[in-house]
């Protein structure tokens, strides 16, 4: 219910302003190859993410109707489906921006924070990689910012749980360890996929997210 209560107003507003749409990628489907192949990106973005968008729009219409009828039981019944598809849409929207075919480096402020909290940048990469690879079933590895404690944190979430809604952390960097993110190319070699993904991390985007999180 807490997730539902926090997001019901967003549902109503979304219905008023229009439907959710699939975000356009900031690069071509083949731009991240050979780390992420063109075929995988086409399916992952154009099929899987599109399905989350379609399902989210459908469930929002149903929830808006139930809310207008004051049918609380129906709203609660739909909330799990809503949370799953909203999380899938939100997580992937961040994930695409977190990737880039162009090499980049973290900002001085972000790199300093990482080194202070994880002893070194390389240790941070090892820790987040291990956490992501260790996800049981489907889920995500995340670098987030804890505004209350004013520090970075890494953690894993299951399925499509949206990081900020379930943990309070501001999402900075996502590692998608659902099988559909890599299986067509790397089969069951999730570890190789996670390790290779550091080469296409968009540190400009991640650093911008960190700067915004720390200044507000």
Curated annotation (Swiss-Prot):
Transit peptide, residues from-to: 1-18
Organism superkingdom: Eukaryota
Residues binding Mn(2+), per UniProt: 44, 92, 176, 180
Keywords, alphabetical: Manganese, Metal-binding, Mitochondrion, Oxidoreductase, Transit peptide
InterPro entries to which the protein is assigned, alphabetical: Fe/Mn_Superoxide_Dismutase, Mn/Fe_SOD, Mn/Fe_SOD_BS, Mn/Fe_SOD_C, Mn/Fe_SOD_N, Mn/Fe_SOD_N_sf, SOD_C_sf
GO molecular function: manganese ion binding; superoxide dismutase activity
The protein's required cofactors: Mn(2+)
A cellular component annotation (GO) from this entry: mitochondrial matrix
PANTHER family per record: SUPEROXIDE DISMUTASE 2, SUPEROXIDE DISMUTASE [MN], MITOCHONDRIAL
Name of protein: Superoxide dismutase [Mn], mitochondrial
Native source organism of the sequence: Glossina morsitans morsitans (Savannah tsetse fly)
The encoding gene: Sod2
């Amino acid at each position: 219910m807490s997730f539902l209560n926090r997001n019901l107003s967003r549902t109503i507003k979304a219905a008023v302003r229009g439907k959710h749409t699939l975000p356009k990628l900031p690069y071509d489907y083949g731009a991240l190859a050979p780390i992420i192949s063109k075929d995988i990106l086409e399916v992952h973005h154009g099929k899987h993410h599109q399905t989350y968008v379609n399902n989210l729009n459908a469930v929002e219409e149903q929830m808006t109707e139930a809310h207008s009828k004051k049918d609380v039981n129906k709203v609660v019944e739909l909330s799990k489906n809503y949370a799953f598809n909203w999380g899938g849409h939100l997580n992937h929207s961040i994930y695409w921006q977190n990737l880039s075919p162009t090499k980049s480096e973290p900002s001085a402020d972000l790199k300093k924070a990482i080194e202070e909290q994880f002893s070194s940048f390389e240790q941070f990469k090892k820790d987040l990689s291990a956490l992501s690879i260790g996800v049981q079933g489907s889920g995500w590895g995340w670098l987030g910012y804890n505004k209350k404690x004013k520090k970075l944190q890494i953690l894993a979430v299951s399925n499509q749980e949206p990081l900020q809604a379930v943990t309070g952390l501001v999402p900075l960097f996502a590692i998608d360890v659902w099988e559909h993110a890599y299986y067509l190319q790397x089969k069951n070699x999730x570890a190789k996929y996670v390790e290779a993904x550091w080469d296409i991390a968009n540190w400009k985007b991640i650093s911008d997210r960190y700067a915004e999180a720390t200044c507000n």
